[in-house]
């Protein structure tokens, strides 16, 4: 979710009300832990290196910071085929190049059915470039996840 630099990190609190997994803004140096949802803090990209988060300013991508493409690319490098990238509703093409990198490294991409997206261009663009991605409505995402 692209947020304002002054949003105060609302996404984590929204996600905490939506389900059982704990969501939090990643802090620079935090270890990646299973069972948690990590969100890029406002105005920062979130990268993964050596099982830790790197939270940086960096240039805007797809006119946004944070953007998901830097996260997807770094996760693909760090975890290869163990990465699951999820592209949800949104504008422009953020998530597309990162999805391509995840697939090239053997990872899995799940894309929200564009017909159910409030803003379909992100899922449409990702699906155009990664046609073998799994497509599902948001309620069906859990059953789309590979069993590891």
Task: Please describe what each predicted stretch is.
Residues 1-148:
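Conserved acid/base catalytic micro-environments in cytosolic active-site loops
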């Amino acid at each position: 979710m692209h947020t304002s630099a002054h949003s105060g990190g609302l996404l984590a609190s929204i996600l905490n009300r939506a389900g059982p997994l704990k969501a939090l803004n990643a802090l620079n140096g935090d270890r990646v832990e299973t069972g948690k949802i990590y969100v890029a803090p406002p105005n920062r990209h979130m990268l993964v290196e050596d099982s830790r988060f790197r939270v940086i300013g960096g240039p805007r991508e797809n006119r946004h910071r944070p953007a998901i493409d830097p996260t997807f690319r770094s996760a693909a490098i760090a975890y290869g085929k163990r990465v699951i990238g999820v592209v949800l509703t949104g504008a422009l093409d953020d998530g597309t190049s990162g999805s391509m990198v995840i697939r090239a490294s053997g990872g899995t991409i799940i894309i929200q059915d564009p017909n159910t997206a409030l803003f379909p261009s992100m899922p449409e663009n990702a699906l155009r470039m990664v046609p073998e991605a799994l497509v599902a409505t948001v309620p069906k995402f859990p059953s789309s996840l590979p069993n590891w």
